[in-house]
Amino acid sequence: MAKKSMVAKSKRPAKFSTQAYTRCEKCGRPHSVYRKFKLCRVCFRELAYKGQIPGVTKASW
């Protein structure tokens, strides 16, 4: 889990566009965040396996 202060800081608008960065909405993780879902890869995988993300299915070929 991310520190509460860092999560609060990321929610504030950045002064400059280059300072903006994405964080996971669920856990606050700053790395490997999918912009479309606003989730990190760990949380995305958990929710996808539970079937809580509509339209996401496990790949099979």
Swiss-Prot record:
Cofactor: Zn(2+)
Metal-binding is among the record's keywords: yes
InterPro entries with a match to the protein in the record: Ribosomal_uS14 (IPR001209), Ribosomal_uS14_bact (IPR023053), Ribosomal_uS14_CS (IPR018271), Ribosomal_uS14_sf (IPR043140)
UniProt-listed Pfam families: Ribosomal_S14
Keyword set includes Magnesium: no
Source organism, top-level taxon: Bacteria
GO cellular component labels: small ribosomal subunit
Keywords from the named record: Metal-binding, Ribonucleoprotein, Ribosomal protein, RNA-binding, rRNA-binding, Zinc
GO terms of biological process kind: translation
Cross-referenced PROSITE patterns: RIBOSOMAL_S14
Residues the record lists as binding Zn(2+): C24, C27, C40, C43
Details of cofactor binding: Binds 1 zinc ion per subunit.
GO molecular function: rRNA binding; structural constituent of ribosome; zinc ion binding
Subunit structure: Part of the 30S ribosomal subunit. Contacts proteins S3 and S10.
Function: Binds 16S rRNA, required for the assembly of 30S particles and may also be responsible for determining the conformation of the 16S rRNA at the A site.
Family that this chain belongs to: Belongs to the universal ribosomal protein uS14 family. Zinc-binding uS14 subfamily.
NCBIfam families, per database record: PRK08061.1
Annotated protein name in UniProt: Small ribosomal subunit protein uS14
